[in-house]
């Protein structure tokens, strides 16, 4: 019987009260964004944000709980933006939308330097009940390398390997977690060159090997090029995540049919950037439709997720979409998935 899991990619919108309070506490300039050296008042405010974001997931009945990433001012570049070997540069557009992040300029060795993300997850663990499984979230190594500027290593291969080792060190410091989602949208928005595909797969392996949890490599805002997908099949992850909102569904299905997939799958079925709220029935139907298109495999686990981070949405809409996911998985749970 296939397990259906309602979860998200993290990076939630800040509650309205927190936007005002944190703006007053931190300041309004680029230099005031999170860099890992926040004072006690700022940390306490983010602690209340974390508690509220976890309560939102609990109320929605999600099957995995993320920390929420309320501190990630620099989106997926956050783990580098707080690193001692990184200097944050100018503002850069975050993919093809109206959000921005500080360019993380890597100027020194990317040794593990304190486990910023691990500390967030430790705090989240303290808020969970015994039966609430934690889901960790990190940028995938290729995406983090693409978002950064290398001013230290001087070689793309060496830089990607260093990013992967840095992320693996972060993961090794994590508290116990049920799943790890590696968010790697650049795999489809800026696909690796043909001669880099194998290195990218190896980098994913490096990060995945650092945990005993199930690892999901989630891409969005497109579909994988054929060669990229074929090489990623060699990566030792438990599931690939596919964007069935903004990605080309025919390309997804072609890749899976031609090259196979893993024993679990993550389906981005709820629009993380559109305020229109899907119905639970519609999302449940999408779960069944996607899994019915590939009659060669029965998935052990199907993760139902938004297609992107949710920080683009108003708080009220984000909460509605969480509830839709929780209810949709319940509706879809009565039938076995063959795919």
PLM features per residue range, with description:
Residues 1-339:
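Domain-level signal for soluble alpha/beta catalytic cores
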């Amino acid at each position: 019987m296939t397990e259906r899991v309602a979860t998200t990619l993290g990076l939630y919108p800040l509650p309205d009260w927190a936007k005002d309070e944190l703006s007053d506490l931190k300041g309004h300039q680029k230099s005031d964004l999170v860099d890992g050296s926040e004072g006690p008042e700022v940390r306490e405010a983010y602690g209340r944000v974390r508690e509220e974001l976890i309560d939102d997931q609990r109320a929605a009945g999600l099957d995995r709980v993320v920390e929420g990433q309320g501190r990630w001012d620099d989106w997926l570049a956050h783990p580098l933006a707080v690193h001692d070997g990184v200097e944050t540069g100018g503002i850069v557009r975050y993919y093809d939308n109206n959000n921005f992040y500080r360019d993380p300029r890597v100027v020194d060795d990317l040794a593990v330097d304190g486990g910023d993300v691990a500390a967030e997850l430790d705090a989240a663990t303290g808020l969970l009940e015994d039966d609430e499984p934690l889901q960790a979230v990190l940028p995938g190594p290729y995406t983090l390398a693409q978002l950064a500027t290398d001013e230290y290593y001087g070689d793309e291969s060496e830089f990607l390997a260093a990013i992967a080792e840095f992320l693996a060190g972060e993961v090794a410091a994590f508290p116990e977690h049920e799943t790890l989602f590696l968010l790697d949208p650049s795999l489809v928005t800026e696909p690796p060159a043909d001669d880099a595909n194998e290195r990218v797969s190896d980098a994913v392996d490096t990060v995945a090997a650092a945990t005993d949890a199930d690892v999901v490599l989630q891409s969005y805002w497109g579909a994988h090029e054929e060669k990229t997908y074929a090489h990623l099949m060699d990566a030792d992850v438990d599931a690939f995540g596919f964007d069935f909102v903004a990605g080309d569904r025919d390309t997804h299905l072609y890749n899976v049919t031609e090259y196979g997939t893993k024993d679990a799958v993550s389906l981005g079925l709820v629009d993380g950037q559109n305020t229109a709220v899907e119905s639970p029935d519609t999302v449940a139907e999408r779960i069944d439709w996607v899994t019915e298109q590939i009659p060669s495999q029965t998935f052990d686990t199907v993760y139902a997720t938004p297609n992107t981070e949710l920080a683009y949405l108003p708080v009220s809409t984000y909460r509605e979409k969480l509830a839709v996911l929780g209810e949709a998985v319940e509706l879809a749970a009565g039938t076995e998935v063959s795919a």
